[in-house]
A protein has these predicted regions:
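Short, charged, amphipathic alpha-helical segments
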Residues: 324-328, 356-365
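Internal helix-loop-helix
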Residues: 46-145
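Charged/polar positions within long, soluble alpha-helices
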Residues: 150, 313, 339-346, 375-382, ...
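Extended amphipathic alpha-helical segments enriched in small hydrophobics
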Residues: 292-351
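Generic structural signal for well-ordered, non-transmembrane alpha-helical segments
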Residues: 35, 39, 136-139, 299-302, ...
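N-terminal-proximal low-complexity accessory segments that begin disordered
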Residues: 1-47
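FAD-binding core of flavoproteins
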Residues: 147, 152-296, 461-485
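Alpha-helix capping/hinge segments and adjacent helical runs
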Residues: 361-485
Length: 485
């Protein structure tokens, strides 16, 4: 089924405990830091019911004869991936910005665990059935699904058992109803989502230890008793929406999730204590989810290109060779991302679970390209936009009767670029490249799917080195013995 925006709002108005800026949130849907992004999320749901978008955003479930969201559909063909691209393009253009947490990028992590059914069956066949049931539920119930990965860390030179044991999420008790967990996780959008796929990120075990209370993964209801959401300060409302159009509409608030003896029903447990299952999910976690994650960065690249080119055109600088060179660098960055995404689906592979996974080497290489070059590309876009993004007065100054007169005079360029359009463009570019929100988003993109060194390690583990080795062996006339190492 597909839900409406109002149904989504009602589902998160469940009495969950949420704090922002030291105050407990009484009305989550109308809190100034959360309302804008909840409105965006509601819009995502409502779009699926509109004639203009329904065919692009949904598909017919042949078993239930109901419409389901394309975002959560397990991909089995290339067309499934192309349909996801179409749906995402419709969403981004409708809302006029970029959001990371749509659910497609986090549901994909469950597909990775689905591929590890043989590992789960060795642990407990019920866990394999649980993941299959939750994939079906995500497909048919249309929840806002997120992913809880990052721990508070603590002293990483010591095992969790040798410090405050709650620094890493762990099981403290088993009951007939399920497991009881303590600890904490950071998660984007948790405070206004329905459920999270919780999993370990750091091995809380040593050597060849096969069992650990820290090796646990489960689906958690974000309104569960004992769960506390402590949010970072929001960017919305710090300045006017006219001056900060992105920060005021697309701030996806991050949360420290505190698990204070939270009961997880057995049917929601995906694996427990077995380090082999934890190792598998860490190695394959982004097998599918890296695709929508990198796709989002492509849209960020489009915004940088558009903002930079408009800024160059308004003053006629787009005719200069040096300016075109930098614009071409932005275009190469964008097309490099797009090429990796396109090729990863064109050369997609069947997964162990029977799904169609993007070509891992190409996709993960594309992620490195997108993330590592993003700071450089933002700097180039900033150069192209020029210094006016840091010196232009705010919207109120343009509207003032006295100061507005002078701003109208000096910000009008010609009949095509009047003062108000220039002000809007400069405000957009400032929020995209220079604001607190822009800095936050840059750091988020660098670490959201693990740090840069882990991205490169994923490429190392998925690139086929046998071809280059064999090529050099033949070219250098080496014996077969060198291939046996």
């Amino acid at each position: 089924m597909i839900r409406t925006g109002n149904q989504y709002r009602e589902s998160i108005n469940d009495g969950r405990q949420v704090w922002i800026d030291g105050e407990k949130v009484k009305d989550i849907c109308n809190h100034p830091s959360l309302k804008p992004i909840i409105d965006i999320r509601s819009r995502m749901y409502d779009m699926a019911h509109e004639d203009k978008y329904q065919e692009k955003l949904t598909y017919l479930d042949e078993e239930t004869n109901e419409l389901n969201t394309v975002y959560h559909k397990p991909p089995r063909t290339r067309d499934d991936w192309y349909e996801k691209d179409t749906a995402m393009d419709s969403l981004m253009h409708d809302i006029g910005g970029v959001v990371i947490r749509v659910s497609d990028e986090t549901v994909g992590e469950m597909w990775s665990l689905f591929d590890g059914q043989d590992v789960l069956n060795e642990v407990d066949p019920q866990f394999a059935r649980n993941i299959e049931n939750h994939i079906i539920r995500a497909t048919r119930d249309d929840p806002f699904h997120v992913s809880a990965n990052t721990d508070p860390k603590g002293d990483r030179s010591r095992l969790p058992q040798d410090q405050d044991p709650d620094m890493l999420l762990h099981v403290v008790k088993e009951t007939d109803a399920g497991i009881v967990v303590r600890g904490a996780k950071f998660e984007t959008a948790a405070a206004y989502s329905n459920q999270a796929f919780v999993k370990p990120t750091i091995g809380g075990w040593a050597g060849n230890e096969k069992l650990s209370d820290y090796a646990v993964s489960f689906i958690c209801d974000m309104g569960a008793p004992g769960l506390k959401h402590i949010c970072r300060s929001g960017f919305s409302g710090r300045g006017s929406v006219e001056d900060y159009p992105l920060a005021n509409n697309f701030d996806e608030v991050d949360t420290l999730l505190v698990f204070d003896n939270v009961l997880v029903p057995w049917e929601n447990v995906l694996f427990y204590r077995h380090t082999s299952a934890a190792a598998f999910i860490r190695a394959t976690l982004h097998r599918y989810s890296a695709y929508p994650f990198v796709t989002r960065i492509r849209y960020v690249a489009d915004m940088m290109i558009g903002a930079a080119l408009f800024n160059a055109r308004q003053t006629g600088l787009d005719k200069h060779q040096a300016v075109r060179e930098k614009l071409a660098m932005l275009a190469c960055y964008r097309e490099g991302i797009n090429a990796h995404l396109t090729a990863s689906i064109a050369l997609a592979e069947k997964s162990p679970g029977g799904l169609l996974m993007p070509n891992q080497s190409l996709l993960l290489t594309g992620r490195v390209h997108a993330c590592t070059r993003l700071p450089e590309m933002m700097h180039i876009a900033r150069e192209l936009c020029g210094g006016q993004i840091c010196v232009t007065p705010n919207h109120a100054a343009f509207n003032d009767k006295e100061s507005g007169h002078w701003l109208e005079k000096f910000y009008n360029v010609n009949e095509n670029w009047v003062a108000e359009d220039r002000r809007k463009l400069l405000a957009f570019a400032r929020d995209l490249l220079n604001s607190d929100y822009a800095g936050h988003r840059l750091t988020f993109q660098l670490f959201a799917q693990s740090p840069p060194f882990a991205h490169l390690n994923a490429v190392y583990n998925n690139f086929d080195f046998s071809g280059p080795l064999d090529f050099v062996r033949n070219a250098a006339g080496l014996s077969e013995k060198v291939m046996q190492q």
